[in-house]
Amino acid sequence: MCSSDLLAGADIIDWFAEEGSRTYGRLVASRGNLAIRQMVLKDPVGPVAAFTPWNFPINQVVRKVGAALAAGCSMLVKGPEETPASPAALVQAFADAGLPEGVLGLVYEIGRAHV
């Protein structure tokens, strides 16, 4: 695993964690009538699937995982068969950090047909 990939991955996780703290709702004025206020709410959309390539195995995974977790979504990552250890270590690090079971999963192959 390349140390630059690991350091970049840590920076990405930090950035999404900060962005996640700003996902509160807000009131905005209506375009047609300034007396009307509209509320913007940001809610999780549900489980997210991510398919990652072999190059930069940490960086490619954290870009997807960081965004999904910051938005409050659970995620299933289909890791690359060519570099299986990096995504597995990353998922384990999230588990060790206290991420609840079932929030982040990792698979490598789904039979012969990818679904």
Residue positions per predicted region:
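Hydrophobic packing residues in well-ordered alpha-helices of helical domains and bundles
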Residues: D5-G9
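Rossmann-like NAD(P) dinucleotide-binding subdomain of oxidoreductase/dehydrogenase enzymes
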Residues: I12-W15, T23-H114
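Short, small-residue-biased leader/transition segments that mark boundaries at the very start
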Residues: M1-S3, H114
